[in-house]
From Swiss-Prot:
The keyword Mitochondrion applies. It comes from the Eukaryota. Pathway: Carbohydrate metabolism; tricarboxylic acid cycle. It is a multi-pass membrane protein. Forms part of complex II containing four subunits: a 70 kDa flavoprotein (FP), a 27 kDa iron-sulfur protein (IP), a cytochrome B and a membrane-anchoring protein. The lineage of its organism: Eukaryota, Discoba, Jakobida, Histionina, Histionidae. This is Succinate dehydrogenase cytochrome b560 subunit. Heme binds at H101. Belongs to the cytochrome b560 family. One of its GO terms (cellular component) is mitochondrial inner membrane. It comes from Reclinomonas americana. PANTHER family: SUCCINATE DEHYDROGENASE CYTOCHROME B560 SUBUNIT, SUCCINATE DEHYDROGENASE CYTOCHROME B560 SUBUNIT, MITOCHONDRIAL. CDD domains: SQR_TypeC_SdhC (cd03499).
Length: 144
């Protein structure tokens, strides 16, 4: 029978308890940097865009099968009454998410090619990516 000694884990935990500090960085003392913040938002925008695509596919299926239904017309009429500001806000943020996700993906392709991997260039490409996402969003919003 194999015997494993886990006493070293207990000793390390006791030492950390004696000096009254957490074993790993806690969220209250951890400062967010642009690199991990942009990575988190890249994942969030990808999820939002995927869910939006699923929602629109579901709506198209409803249109295809239930176009003559009274319930569908009543829902469309109700949504039409409240569609002003809400529709504009949702469409603006979806456009921003599309451009943000596009430029973040291009940034990752540049990294995959082996360029801009120094920390200064990582920060610079992050700021450039943010600026391009907002700029292209505003340009597309003005044009369309």
């Amino acid at each position: 029978m194999i015997s494993i000694n886990f006493n070293f884990l207990k000793i390390k935990g006791i030492i950390n308890m004696n000096i009254n500090r957490p074993i790993s960085p806690h969220l209250t003392i951890y400062k967010l940097q642009i690199t991990n913040t942009l990575s988190i938002f890249h994942r969030i925008t990808g999820g939002v865009l995927a869910l939006t695509l699923c929602f629109f596919i579901l709506i198209l299926k409803m249109l295809n099968f239930h176009l003559s239904s009274y319930a569908f017309y009543s829902i469309a009429y109700t949504l039409n009454q409240y569609s002003g500001f809400l529709f504009i806000a949702i469409s603006f943020f979806l456009l921003l998410f599309i451009f943000y996700h596009l430029f973040a993906g291009l940034r990752h392709l540049v990294w995959d090619a082996g360029y801009a991997l120094e920390i200064e260039n990582v920060y610079l490409t992050g700021y450039i990516m943010l600026g391009l996402a907002f700029l292209f969003t505003l340009i597309a919003w003005i044009i369309f």
